[in-house]
Amino acid sequence: NFDEPFADSSALATYVVANKTKQHVTVALTGDGGDEVFGGYNKYYIGKLNHKYTTIIPKGFHSTVANFATSLLKTTDDKRGKRFKANRLIKAINYEGDFYYNIISLGFQEDEVKNFLKSDYYKNNPLQFYKEIIGSKNKTITDFRNIDRHLSLEGDMLVKVDRTSMLTSLECRAPFLNKEIWNFTNQLPENYLINGWDKKHILKEAFKEYFPKDFLNKSKKGFGVPV
């Protein structure tokens, strides 16, 4: 149903939810685009902190700090995913070059890819167009959000929801992807989207009278399944 290999395990869970939903309705609203439109991902503000980290801490101490940070996470079954994410983040920060490029490189850094891919495969870098689009300018949260819109949102999440929902004859619509909303948030100052550590700040402020505070401040949970 995907017409090509699709390495997003959350497609399985999405299909189950779509199948259950179809038993009650024929059209459903999704939250797709909420993080890209309103700045809901941790990597957005972490990207801004990267410059401070690499300039304050001398380069010779980067590896020491990285090893110490990852050692704080024990490798128990329930912490293994967190340890992997921490290692990935620290490698991205510590790696020479573009931090955000390293974060979106599917879990592997350039030096790792060179070790296990033949040169012919490595030459065809699917993310090369990203560097060409953004260039070497200082990136803003809006730049990060636009990258995700073209890469993960259009190429993964929307494909996943469309294929799995239509397989159950359920029609899904994504109100957050209204063009006017996207254009509006692109014109806002960054602190309207990420205020300190508060992600999707303006969205929470707009609906705080309708939802309890604990609901608005719940931690993010992925939808992937163990594969």
Can you name each region flagged by the protein language model?
Residues L151, T168-C172, V225-V227:
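A ubiquitous short alpha-helical element
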Residues T21, R149-R163, T185:
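Short Ser/Thr-interspersed hydrophobic loop/turn segments at strand-loop and sheet-helix junctions
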Residues N146, V159, L216-K218:
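A generic structural signal for short, non-catalytic loop/turn and secondary-structure boundary residues
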Residues A7, G135-D148:
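Structural motif
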Residues K123-I134:
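A short, charged helix-loop
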Residues F211-V227:
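PAPS-dependent sulfotransferase catalytic core
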Residues N1-N124, T164-E209:
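ATP-dependent adenylate-handling active sites, centered on carboxylate activation for C-N bond formation
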